[in-house]
A protein has these predicted regions:
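Juxtamembrane intracellular "pre-TM" segments in multi-pass secondary transporters
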Residues: 173-204
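Short hydrophobic/alpha-helical segments at membrane-entry points of transmembrane helices
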Residues: 87-93, 202-203
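Pair of pore-lining "gating" transmembrane helices in MFS-fold secondary transporters
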Residues: 1-16, 196-213
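Helix-loop-helix hairpin linking two adjacent transmembrane segments in secondary transporters
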Residues: 124-172
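Cytoplasmic helix-loop-helix junction between adjacent transmembrane helices
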Residues: 92-129
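Conserved MFS/SLC helix-loop-helix module at the cytosolic interface between two early adjacent transmembrane helices
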Residues: 48-86
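Residue-level signature of mid-helix packing/kink "hotspots" within the transmembrane helices
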Residues: 15, 43-51, 101, 134-135
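Extracytoplasmic
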Residues: 2-32, 103, 217-218
Length: 218
């Protein structure tokens, strides 16, 4: 349950801005035509994090990597909360998405730590927390922004990330992956897997379509 909460709270950072863009844009001097860049850059940052940051989970000590990533998220959320210029807000939006991929390091780590007989249940619970975080982020953001202003939402999110970082530091044991490949080789292996595994391509296509459909709705 603890890991499920952490994953849900971390991934929610990607979606907090979406329902309150109409409040953010005029306050930071962003034109309506460019306001959608907030959402786009956050998602682009997440995609970049998946490609460039998550593979480091096979090279670096996992707990340390997650804490550093969370610290970047905290700084980015605070940057969003205090941003006065559109360029600054767009930059930290990219970083918020980039640093939110720590959930994709936490999930396999939790699977590694769980007993074999309960591994599926543990991963399922964590994924449930992740999806719940996505679903609740928008109404929570709207509620907080309506009562306290949109900047308060990012301050609150930063505070939650501080709490999560402390919890992870205290509860997760260190794990140094036993992997001999270099970072470049790991990045290259992503293309190799996609090329040699037709089932992976099929599942990736399905998931991409599902995410696109969900994004259109939510």
């Amino acid at each position: 349950m603890l890991f499920a909460f952490c994953c849900g709270a971390i991934v929610a950072n990607i979606y907090y801005a979406q329902p309150i863009i109409e409040l953010i844009a005029p306050d930071i001097g962003l034109t309506p035509a460019l306001a959608s860049l907030i959402v786009s850059l956050t998602q682009i940052g997440y995609a970049l994090g998946l490609f460039f940051l998550v593979p480091l989970g096979d090279l670096l000590e996992n707990r340390k990597l997650m804490i550093i990533t969370n610290l970047v998220a905290i700084a980015s959320l605070l940057g969003a909360a205090f941003a006065e210029q559109p360029n600054v807000f767009l930059l930290v939006s990219l970083l918020i998405g980039f640093s939110s991929v720590s959930v994709q390091i936490l999930i396999p780590l939790a699977a590694h730590l769980a007993p074999a007989e309960s591994r599926g249940r543990v991963v399922g619970s964590i994924m449930g927390g992740l999806l719940l975080g996505i679903l609740l982020a928008r109404p929570v953001s709207s509620l907080v922004a309506d009562h306290f202003g949109w900047r308060a939402m990012f301050m609150a999110a930063a505070a939650v990330m501080v709490f999560i970082s402390a919890v992870l530091m205290l509860t997760i044991p260190k794990r140094q992956p036993d992997h001999s490949a270099s970072y470049g080789q790991l990045l290259g292996s992503l293309g190799t897997l996609l090329r040699k595994q037709p089932l992976l391509r099929q599942r990736a296509f399905y998931q991409g379509c599902m995410f696109a459909t969900f994004s259109l709705f939510w």
